[in-house]
C-alpha cells in the first residue's frame, strides 16, 4: 500500500488514503477483506469532480487498466462488448470506431472507465434519445465485501443490478461488464449549429414541441454572464452520426484522437475571472452562425473537445473549481429561468455552462437523469459568496422537484439527497443486503450520509 494524496477532477478537497493497485481479482479480495473502520472504495481515472473516489484515512483500490476482470472483446456481429471495469472509454473507442461501433453513451470526456460509467450511470447529449449508460449494460460481475463475485443483470438479481447502476461504487467493486454498442458508418458527426438570442429561444428550440426529438444528440451552451434581453442566450448544437456518404472520401472510419495542447504547469487563480470569461463568452457566441448551419465534425471535436487539452482542470489555479449540475422537471421552466438569472445577477463567471433536455428515468434508484432540464456549469471554487448562492439555488431546485448529480457534487447538504432521490431508502436496503459489513465507503458517502438510515 502507498499513502497518496487524492482529489476529484475539480481539485478542491484533497485527502490522503492508502492506495493499492491490484494485480488480479484475488488481490482485490485481499484488500477488501482487510478494510478497516474507514472502509474501501474503488477509483478509476479520477474524473468525478468531487470526492466520490476518495476515502480519507481508508483504502482506495486504484482500478484503471485491464489487470482485473475478463479481457476486452467486441463481437462485431452483435455489437456486444465485454470489458474489464478499469478499461477506459478511450481505449474502447480506439478499437471499436474503426470497426463500425460507437459507445451507446459518452459524457464530455472519454477518459472514464467502464466501471465508473456504470457507478455514475453517465449520460450524454443523447439521453432524450438513448437514455443513460446503465440502460445498455447487459450484465456485470461485481465483487461484494464478502469476497464473493456475483453476476448482475436486469434479469438476474435485478434489484442489486439497478442499485449498482448509479450507486457510486458503494455496493461493490465492478470487475467487468457486457454492454451493447451503437453501429456507425463513419467516425464523423453531422452537426447543426445555430445561435439563439435569449433564454426563451433556447428553451423553445429544445422543447418537445420543437424538432429536438429528431436529433440523436442535442446540447446548448449557455452564456451565464449575459443579462437583460440576452440573459440565457446560447449556441445550440445538434447532430447524428454521419453516413459514409456524408463523411466524404478516404477511410471514413479512421479514428485517432489527439491531445493537441497542454495546460501550463502553473496558472494564477484569477486567470479565469469575470472579465476574461465575459470576453470569451462574447467571442464564442459571435462566432456561432446566426442561422442554422450544417457541417461535419470528428467524433473528438463533437463529443470530447476538452480532452484535446491535457490537464485543463488546472486552469482555475490552485483554488480548484466546482462543477454544479442539477435537473428540474420539464414543467419547471420558470425555475430554470430564475436559476440562470440568479447566477447572471451575481456575476458568477462560467465559460462552461450547458443545458440539455433529458428523457425518462431508468429503474436505478440513485441514477441522476430523469425527464427534465439539466444545467451544468463550472465555477472557480473561490468566488466570493458562492456557497450562499448555491444554497439558494439548491432550495429552488429541490422545491421544484429536482435533484443534483452526485458524481459531480462537492457542495449539497445530506437532506438534498433524501429530497431529490425519493427511492433512496430502496437503494439503501439493497446496498445493505450487498454489504452488511458496510465495508464500502468514500468521502462523498460520509459527507452526505449515504450509508445512514433516517
Language model regions located:
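Noncatalytic alpha-helical scaffold of FAD-dependent oxidoreductases
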Residues: 1-454
